[in-house]
């Protein structure tokens, strides 16, 4: 993977689910709702001064959200940040940079 270029879409891993779980409360607070399901399906990553993760998450029924989560460099010791998100997504919607 080149620095700055997003990776190809990959199936979600246990690490991806952990990242999504760590920002779930941030999303639920911003959307003012609780999601009955929160399962990471796929992701892309982008190496910057840290790592951006673009994660497609199933949130119940036919509903999906796309998350952009920033993970700082290890020596900075900062929590994960929900940088941006997109709601009203479907399973077939492409996971792209936003």
Swiss-Prot record:
Signal peptide: none annotated. The record marks 4 as: Reactive site. A motif (Secondary area of contact) lies at residues 46-50. GO terms for molecular function: cysteine-type endopeptidase inhibitor activity. One of its GO terms (cellular component) is cytosol. InterPro entries: Cystatin_dom, Cystatin_sf, Prot_inh_cystat_CS, Prot_inh_stefin. Keywords: Acetylation, Cytoplasm, Nucleus, Protease inhibitor, Thiol protease inhibitor. It is found in: Cytoplasm; Nucleus. The modification N-acetylmethionine is found at residue 1. The keyword Phosphoprotein does not apply. The keyword Nucleus applies. This is an intracellular thiol proteinase inhibitor. Tightly binding reversible inhibitor of cathepsins L, H and B. Able to form dimers stabilized by noncovalent forces. Belongs to the cystatin family. PANTHER family: CYSTATIN FAMILY MEMBER, CYSTATIN-B. This is Cystatin-B. It comes from Macaca fuscata fuscata. The lineage of its organism: Eukaryota, Metazoa, Chordata, Craniata, Vertebrata.
């Amino acid at each position: 993977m080149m620095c700055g270029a997003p990776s190809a879409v990959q199936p979600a891993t246990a690490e991806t689910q952990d990242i999504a779980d760590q920002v779930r409360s941030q999303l639920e607070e911003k959307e003012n709702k609780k999601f009955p399901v929160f399962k990471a399906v796929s992701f892309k990553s982008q190496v910057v001064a840290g790592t951006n993760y673009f994660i497609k998450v199933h949130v119940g029924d036919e509903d999906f959200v796309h998350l952009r989560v920033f993970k700082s460099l290890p020596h900075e010791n900062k929590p994960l940040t929900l940088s941006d998100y997109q709601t009203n997504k479907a399973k077939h919607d492409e996971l792209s940079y936003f």
